[in-house]
From Swiss-Prot:
NCBIfam families noted in UniProt: HscA, PRK05183.1
InterPro entries xref list: ATPase_NBD (IPR043129), Heat_shock_70_CS (IPR018181), HscA_NBD (IPR042039), HSP70_C_sf (IPR029048), HSP70_peptide-bd_sf (IPR029047), Hsp_70_fam (IPR013126), ISC_FeS_clus_asmbl_HscA (IPR010236)
GO-annotated biological processes: iron-sulfur cluster assembly
One MF annotation (Gene Ontology) recorded for this entry: unfolded protein binding
Role noted for this protein: Chaperone involved in the maturation of iron-sulfur cluster-containing proteins. Has a low intrinsic ATPase activity which is markedly stimulated by HscB. Involved in the maturation of IscU.
Gene for this chain: hscA
SUPFAM superfamilies to which the protein is assigned, alphabetical: Actin-like ATPase domain, Heat shock protein 70kD (HSP70), C-terminal subdomain, Heat shock protein 70kD (HSP70), peptide-binding domain
Keywords: ATP-binding, Chaperone, Nucleotide-binding
Descriptive protein name: Chaperone protein HscA
Similarity remark: Belongs to the heat shock protein 70 family.
Superkingdom of the source species: Bacteria
Amino acid sequence: MALLQISEPGLSAAPHQRRLAVGIDLGTTHSLVATVRSGEAQTLTDSDGRDLLPSVVHYRHDGHSVGWHARDNAVHDLENTVSSVKRLMGRSLADIQQRYPHLPYRFHASDNGLPLIQTSAGNLNPVQVSADILSALAARAESALGGVPDGVVITVPAYFDDAQRQGTKDAARLAGLHVLRLLNEPTAAAIAYGLDSGKEGVIAIYDLGGGTFDISVLRLSRGVFEVLATGGDSALGGDDFDHLLAEWLREQAGVHDRDDRQLDHAFRDAAVKAKIALSSADAIDVDVAGWQGTITREQLDALIAPLVKRTLLSCRRTLKDAGLTAQDVQEVVMVGGSTRVPLVREQVGTFFGRTPLTSIDPDKVVAIGAAIQADILVGNKPDSEMLLLDVIPLSLGLETMGGLVEKIIPRNTTIPVARAQEFTTFKDGQSGMMIHLLQGEREMVTDCRSLARFSLRGLPSLPAGGAHIRVTFQVDADGLLSVTAMEKSTGVEASIQVKPSYGLSDTEIATMITDSMLNAKEDVGARRLAEQKVESARVLESLQSALVADAALLSNDEKGIIVAASEHLHTMMQGSDPVAIEAAIKTVDQQTQEFAARRMDASIRRALAGHSVDEV
């Protein structure tokens, strides 16, 4: 049968009934909400026609305000005005104090060590502050659409961990939103440009926002985006451009008073306006704090050039992490308002050797991609156009030594999806590997469903653990699983395709999940025992090879002690006590440490034989 089509109770779309769906870009500096109308994705504005909502909340004894009004209050009531709360999401108080020591807020630790921000409205955690921002966006959407959205897609940075993602979901729940999916920001940007339905290849997402810089390298294959590498600088953004320009204006005006917050605000405001104007003009007149003068684009470029260079160094490092060069990138997508700066576009184009995509407003592109995805997920696309986005009903994995199952893609993962993991060889000189694909939630191969087997041959003759095989699982939108195994040093690869859920009924899937829950404790015990037996076999095989090669390095007494320890380990292996096996492994390790050191010394002497000191 096909993969289960899952929808929340009460959310199964009736024929011809259009559902309200929105995409939200919950940003560090600004946030946006967008929807699809008449087949076109568009951002929703406030009553003053503004798309952007500053991600700022001002708290009072009698309530709070969000957005532009809250941002204006920052000058007068800094301690009760929370901004850039996205940086705090999912972090402990100790982590925040280490990373951001100069924040103006007063923090308290909750019982579980999470941060609480002290405000006039009480102590609030980052999830609650984020919920207030999301509530403001939800109210804007409800007003514009004439009803409560049936579902929302919220974007998050690709590097967000589970705690940060869960915090975002919790904030949405507090705001009364039904989250269809969290979507990686770079993927949303690529979707906005329609790259998900275009040619396959490598895409770079250059995201220079107000407070942070992120670079993401994606590979698009069969409609699936795989994040190859991410990088960036959490302390570099357009705000730093503004700061440099404001400092330059201070120097020109001869103003050095750092205690006047209103004066600070005036210079910063003048810097922001000048930066925006210089995106389309060659020069701009400035009047601030009694100083009048002109700043040119050339002067601005000179100020910010070192910061732009820092972003490109991050790009180079991230490409290196992905094993790629700038020439391997087919498309470059610009995200974030700071990418409007002409120098940024020029330098990025030069670095990648191609013109970046900038036709969609860089402030809006992530929200637009999220809106397109939300429109699909609530079922508004006609069948002929709709990409089936479903979940994997049972975990997918492969067999490892000892009859164990290594899960690669957990159940309930949204498809399409791609995940990869590295494995290595178990024996010296191993020239091939049989890859056994499995489906299920249990820890042992015998308790899971076998999907397929395929072989990878032609591995280089190396010691155990020397060859590195990258196994990639990819499930497309139709539920078709493709698995590729590649040895990294030689490029030797093999692959197979299989329909994971073919032949399974809903009842069988439910039974497999229930069995995994009922047998969880026994399964964990069985896995631990199997893992210790595999490790024992590895230790004994390695020791046997060492004794054959270098027994001459040991006295008879020393060899006798090692052999006795190995025989004891072999005996323990036949039993069913993982603790006893682990203890026997430690004994062998202790008894062979001096032997290992002598073997290392002998190996070094052999390697240096016949060479002078100058050659080493």
